[in-house]
């Protein structure tokens, strides 16, 4: 798999994306794309569509190429967790423990925290003002309520790639 940053055309097919909706707008982030040379590329952009206003997806550049990352939204902001990332063109894929935030109103990105463990396949949710990161590759669940804490390790349902942690 090539893991470089790649300019992808609009309306291309990609897999292993993460998606979330915020205020009638759909965001599809990262993923894998197979280019004309049959190389697999980790995508460094996000597609956005306001279902009431837009007739076509618009493209927003992400600070790093990501795949298998978790995503959630709260108060109109998008939060990203873990996954595999590429920061330099043709660099290696690396497990990621970064929690980053995107503000759609200002088009600004922020790094806000780091989980305890680097996670290659993750899910993210926020419940009662607490972030939970589910590691699908190693079965860990971490939570953030002021500091990161490991809440479960080797949880079988997570390791089995379940959509539900229990």
Swiss-Prot record:
<comment type="similarity">
    <text>Belongs to the poxviruses Kelch family.</text>
</comment>
<dbReference type="InterPro" id="IPR015915">
    <property type="entry name" value="Kelch-typ_b-propeller"/>
</dbReference>
<keyword id="KW-0677">Repeat</keyword>
<feature type="repeat" description="Kelch 1">
    <location>
        <begin position="25"/>
        <end position="76"/>
    </location>
</feature>
<feature type="repeat" description="Kelch 2">
    <location>
        <begin position="77"/>
        <end position="129"/>
    </location>
</feature>
<keyword id="KW-0880">Kelch repeat</keyword>
<protein>
    <recommendedName>
        <fullName>Kelch repeat protein B10</fullName>
    </recommendedName>
</protein>
């Amino acid at each position: 798999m090539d893991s470089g940053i790649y300019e992808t055309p609009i309306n291309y097919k990609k897999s292993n994306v993460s998606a979330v909706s915020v205020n009638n707008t759909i965001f599809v982030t990262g993923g894998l794309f197979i280019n004309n040379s049959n190389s697999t590329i980790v995508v460094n952009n996000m597609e956005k569509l306001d279902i009431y206003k837009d007739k076509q997806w618009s493209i927003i550049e992400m600070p790093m190429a990501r795949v298998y990352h978790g995503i959630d939204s709260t108060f109109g902001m998008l939060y990203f967790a873990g996954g595999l990332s590429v920061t330099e063109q043709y660099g290696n894929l690396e497990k990621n423990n970064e929690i980053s935030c995107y503000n759609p109103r200002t088009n600004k990105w922020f790094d806000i925290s780091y989980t305890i463990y680097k996670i290659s396949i993750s899910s993210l949710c926020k419940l009662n003002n607490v972030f939970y990161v589910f590691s699908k590759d190693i079965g860990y669940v971490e939570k953030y309520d002021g500091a990161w804490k490991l809440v479960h390790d080797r949880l079988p349902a997570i390791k089995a790639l379940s959509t539900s942690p229990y």
